């Protein structure tokens, strides 16, 4: 995460076109519709403009079914199984890594995609799928596992592991020390796909001889049972997870491997709560932390780290990925301006901002209206709340919806770097927060940094009418240091989830130097081969006024609430949610107390002395809470008008303020995107080993072709990148390479990509190789043409078809590397 923290991903650039409001519509209503079929009819009838959840493919598979609708296909989400590896007084078979690994052969990924998901997905075995920019660089590592549904092999692996641990199978029932081994599966009942996945996995485990108890629930219950409990209590053994994609498309993902596989990110069983049993893996931590903080010297070294982390994460199998989703979203045909971000999909932050309707209002159906909590530190962590909250704030920088490149929104920048191996001199009067002395300290002479970023910040009014200023930025930075530093004895500025993550940011931060009211220099020990990523890492911003931050902080320090889910469970207090009236009242009480005592937070005492300014801040936020019954105050194009739990509805309204920098339509260009398309491929259905193979490819709106050729044993024999000459390129497979092909089905994957749109069109096929040219048929070349399609995601169906074809490849079980070779 960036230096900005304190407020979720801070981010965005800098233009100065002044307007009264940044959106076309005046009001957006988010209304809960649990049933997708009901929501579909409401969109057709015009009672809903958009539904922010996938629609079953069989409901919109005909022209008649789509009448009155626009259908958008989005990628980015996925399904996984989280397995509890805890050691406990009660025997837990999943504490044995071989048992966890065997689950990969117990789940039928093809069945999940083809039957449960109606073909709208792709099997996946790691956290990266075909739609992720980093996928192509680690594809051969992923392919090396060759998982397939093989319950016989799974049973063999599990039996060997359990018998070695002392378990016995009596009358087809696994026992340990005379007691039946019972597994508890927490199964999401609010998602039909995950409910079915849970039922199928439970059935497979029962068939192997385990007693399985099914515990059904939604995300709120999962926050308590799975994410909020001590894993060693064994309240759950496996959980059917679902991921809604990111809030933005990311070209160079620094977080994914750490989030999905590594303990330090506080997203693995135990969640870094010191009072709980915690999954540990120092090797994964070290690799993924290097990726996160940019501790590599080249793009090649970064890719090597990705390969190692992927290999270890899959081998450990604490989180097992099943399928990447292709979600179909429906939009009423009278609604315009939808922006289908490659990461967030239709629920991108840009869609409500850019949408246009005949009524100047927008009504969006959502699957859940409230899950988890709303606070900018460790709340807003679920898809449902993030989709709404992201429209309420502007970040400093953000990610381009189709390239994943970092671009400015509320801060422009200039980068100077000496990385990866050099350093810059930091001015002596640059400052950093010292948690021990509770003061800002000058860095002093001789201080060095790898990079320097100068930011020009584009401030506007907060929703409560107060002008953003440099104090909001400095308080955000203080908070990052205070709560991200190593905890001291009886340290109350520590959060079990937030602190370990933020500590990685803090160690790269050297100092800042405010230049004027809206310009600041940031010095970091961070390097990336893309300078925009350095700016992203160093960016300073806040989505929340400093006085709200100070009140939240004091409420947590006083033990009234917790920033995080796990902290709330372990301390027996509420998970702070600023949208809830009771929690907002706590914030108001602290603001009133601050005003009465003329309190100025220590982090601002060197910069603020004007009592009138401080009191105006307190007064404005107190007034806001009194009038709105919540404490969500931010700086984006919409403000939170009201949350009605009874009506299951949240309403946001356009922030009409002359200081807001972007006019309606500012992001309109994101509506139009040209996808790379494969138009034609000529390749033999049968080839002769030892001969040169030429494969002409024709594509449009594309710049490069990536290809991967594997033989019938699953060994990669050729891979490469070809530049397109106009629309054409020839893939040449040499004599030596074709000699390595097998007699069975050989697999070819072709990815056509564009520099401007990082969504590949993909073609996958299998062909035979023979040693005798007389065995070749008279007609050996198969050509196909793909006609132009109105469907932007023309390549997605090639992926689905390709995934089915791939299943014909002869399977070779991957030999696992020993633990000794993988550990350090």
Language model features: what each stretch is:
Residues 19-26, 58-59, 65, 93, ...:
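Surface-exposed, Gly/Pro/Thr- and Asp/Glu-enriched linker/hinge segments
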Residues 20-61, 211, 663-689, 694-696:
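Ligand-site clamp/hinge motif
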Residues 21-22, 32, 54-157, 175-177, ...:
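Local pocket/hinge segments that shape ligand/substrate recognition
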Residues 39-47, 90-102, 106, 424-489:
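Aromatic- and charge-enriched surface segment that lines or borders ligand/interaction sites
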Residues 42-44, 48-55, 64, 207-266, ...:
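Periplasmic binding protein-like
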Residues 95-203, 207, 308, 360-365, ...:
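Append "and occasionally in soluble cytosolic enzymes with long acidic Gly/Pro-rich linkers
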Residues 101, 113-116, 213-223, 252-332, ...:
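Extracytoplasmic/peripheral linker and loop segments enriched in polar/acidic and small residues
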Residues 256, 331-372, 380-384, 639-642, ...:
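Long beta-strand-rich cores associated with HINT superfamily self-processing modules
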């Amino acid at each position: 995460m960036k230096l900005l923290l304190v407020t979720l991903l801070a981010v965005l650039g800098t233009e100065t076109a002044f307007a009264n409001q940044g959106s076309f519509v005046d009001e957006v209503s988010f209304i809960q519709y649990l049933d997708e079929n009901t929501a579909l009819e409401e969109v057709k009838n015009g009672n809903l403009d958009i539904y922010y959840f996938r629609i079953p493919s069989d409901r919109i598979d005909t022209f008649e079914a789509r009448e009155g609708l626009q259908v958008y296909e989005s990628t980015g989400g996925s399904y996984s199984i989280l397995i509890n590896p805890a050691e406990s007084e009660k025997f837990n078979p999943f504490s044995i890594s071989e048992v966890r690994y065997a689950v990969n052969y117990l789940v039928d990924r093809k069945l999940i995609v083809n039957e449960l998901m109606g073909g709208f997905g792709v099997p996946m075995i790691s956290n990266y799928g075909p739609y992720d920019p980093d996928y192509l660089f680690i594809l051969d590592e992923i392919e090396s596992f060759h998982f397939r549904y093989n319950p016989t092999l799974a049973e063999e692996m599990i039996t060997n592991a359990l018998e070695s641990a002392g378990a016995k199978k009596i009358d087809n029932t696994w026992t340990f020390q005379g007691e039946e081994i019972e597994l508890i599966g927490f199964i999401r009942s609010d998602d039909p796909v995950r409910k079915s996945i849970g039922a199928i996995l439970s059935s497979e485990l029962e068939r192997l001889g385990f007693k399985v108890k099914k515990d059904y629930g939604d995300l709120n219950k999962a926050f308590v049972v799975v994410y909020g409990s001590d894993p060693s209590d064994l309240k759950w053994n496996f959980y059917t997870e679902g991921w809604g994609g990111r809030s933005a498309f990311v070209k160079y993902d620094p977080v994914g491997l750490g989030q999905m596989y590594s303990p330090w990110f506080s997203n693995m069983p135990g969640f870094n709560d010191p009072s709980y049993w915690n999954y540990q893996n120092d090797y994964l931590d070290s690799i993924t932390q290097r990726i996160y903080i940019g501790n590599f010297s080249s793009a090649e070294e970064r890719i090597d780290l990705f390969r190692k982390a992927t290999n270890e994460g899959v081998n450990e199998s604490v989180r097992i990925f099943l399928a990447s989703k292709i979600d179909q979203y429906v939009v009423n045909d009278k609604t315009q301006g939808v922006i289908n971000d490659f990461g967030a999909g239709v629920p991108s932050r840009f869609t409500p901002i850019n949408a246009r309707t005949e009524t100047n209002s927008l009504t969006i159906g959502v699957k859940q209206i409230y899950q988890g909590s709303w606070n900018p530190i460790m709340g807003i962590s679920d898809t449902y709340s993030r989709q709404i909250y992201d429209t309420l704030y502007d970040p400093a920088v953000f990610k381009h919806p189709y390239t994943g490149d970092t671009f400015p929104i509320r801060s422009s920048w200039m980068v100077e770097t000496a990385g990866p191996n050099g350093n810059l001199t930091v001015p002596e009067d640059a400052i950093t927060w010292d948690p021990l002395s509770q003061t800002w300290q000058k860095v002093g002479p001789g201080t060095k940094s790898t990079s320097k970023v100068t930011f020009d910040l584009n401030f506007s009014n907060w929703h409560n009418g107060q002008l953003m200023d440099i104090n909001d930025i400095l308080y955000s930075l203080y908070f990052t240091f205070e709560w991200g530093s190593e905890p001291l004895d009886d340290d109350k500025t520590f959060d079990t989830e937030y602190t370990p993550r933020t500590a990685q940011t803090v160690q790269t931060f050297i100092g800042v130097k405010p230049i004027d009211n809206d310009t600041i220099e940031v010095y970091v020990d961070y390097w990336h081969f893309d300078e925009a990523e350095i700016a992203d890492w160093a960016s300073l911003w806040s989505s929340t006024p400093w006085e709200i931050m100070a009140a939240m902080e004091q409420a947590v320090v006083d033990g009234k609430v917790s920033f995080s889910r796990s902290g709330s469970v372990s301390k027996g207090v509420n998970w702070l949610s600023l949208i809830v009236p009771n929690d907002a009242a706590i914030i108001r009480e602290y603001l009133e107390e601050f005003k009465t005592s003329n309190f100025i937070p220590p982090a601002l005492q060197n910069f603020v002395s004007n009592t009138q300014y401080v009191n105006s801040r307190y007064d404005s936020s107190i007034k806001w809470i009194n009038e709105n019954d919540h404490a969500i105050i931010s700086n984006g194009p919409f403000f939170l008008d009201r949350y009605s739990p009874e009506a299951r509805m949240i309403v946001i309204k356009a922030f009409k303020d002359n200081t807001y920098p972007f006019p309606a339509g500012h992001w309109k260009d994101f509506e139009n995107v040209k996808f790379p398309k494969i138009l034609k491929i000529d390749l033999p259905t049968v080839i002769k080993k030892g001969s040169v193979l030429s494969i002409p490819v024709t594509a449009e709106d594309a710049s490069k072709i990536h290809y991967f050729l594997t033989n019938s044993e699953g060994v990669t024999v050729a891979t490469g990148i070809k530049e397109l000459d106009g629309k054409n390129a020839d893939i040449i497979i040499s004599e030596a390479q074709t000699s390595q092909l097998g007699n069975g089905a050989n697999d070819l994957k072709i990815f056509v990509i564009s520099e401007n749109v990082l969504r590949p069109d993909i073609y996958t096929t299998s062909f035979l190789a023979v040693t005798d040219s007389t065995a070749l048929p008279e007609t050996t070349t198969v050509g196909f043409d793909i006609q132009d399609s109105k469907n932007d995601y023309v390549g997605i169906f090639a992926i689905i078809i390709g995934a089915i074809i791939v299943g014909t490849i002869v399977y070779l079980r991957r030999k696992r590397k020993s633990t000794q070779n993988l550990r350090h």
